[in-house]
């Protein structure tokens, strides 16, 4: 699956407008979710658009959703040699990432790209690769909102990005909690000005 924004292995946008959370259980994805564009924002009346954000193994964007017992495995067929070749081909002379780099997109997660007011319960990401540019997480690219929780579960994927890269979540936002979650995947920041990299967040 290749998308420019709001792209997921099961659904692109899980937006629940009600105040009560909707529960989804046992979702699975074993396909590759690829980012087709880096971040680009514009506002031109009715033609406003945002590209290059919100990519996830299950969902690109979630709001007021409880996701439990779900599993995602992305890029599991990619070999280490293929990854190294792709990454090396995506550097400019000064070490900056180019548009040819596989490290594209903001808010990229093994399960969800970005979640607001959501819970992830006992979800896992299997051995594979989660690749993005900024705000890249093994389970979630970014979290925001009250009572947001990740409980249980694990990440086994290799997580690579440029800035704000975490084994579980890239940035743990306002009033959010992460507990009982393990990460066994490699986490690394690559390219010029790489920064803010953590095993969990």
Task: Give residue ranges: language-model regions.
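Surface-exposed loop/turn motifs in large extracellular/passenger domains
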Residues: 1-201
């Amino acid at each position: 699956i290749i998308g420019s924004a709001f792209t997921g292995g099961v659904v692109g946008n899980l937006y629940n407008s009600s105040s009560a959370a909707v529960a989804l259980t046992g979702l699975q994805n074993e396909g590759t979710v690829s980012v087709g564009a880096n971040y680009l924002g514009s506002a031109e009346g009715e033609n406003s658009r945002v590209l290059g954000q919100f990519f996830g193994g299950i969902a690109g964007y979630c709001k007021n959703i409880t996701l439990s017992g779900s599993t995602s495995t992305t890029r599991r067929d990619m070999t280490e040699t293929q990854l190294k070749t792709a990454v090396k081909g995506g550097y400019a002379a000064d070490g900056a990432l180019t548009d040819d780099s596989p490290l594209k997109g903001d808010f990229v997660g093994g399960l969800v790209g970005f979640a607001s007011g959501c819970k992830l319960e006992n979800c896992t990401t299997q051995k594979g690769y989660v690749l993005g540019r900024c705000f890249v997480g093994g389970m979630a690219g970014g979290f925001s909102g009250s009572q947001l929780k990740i409980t249980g579960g694990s990440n086994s994927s290799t997580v690579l990005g440029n800035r704000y890269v975490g084994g579980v979540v890239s940035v743990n936002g306002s009033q959010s909690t992460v507990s009982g979650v393990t990460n066994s995947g490699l986490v690394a920041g690559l390219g010029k000005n790489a920064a803010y990299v953590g095993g969990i967040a």
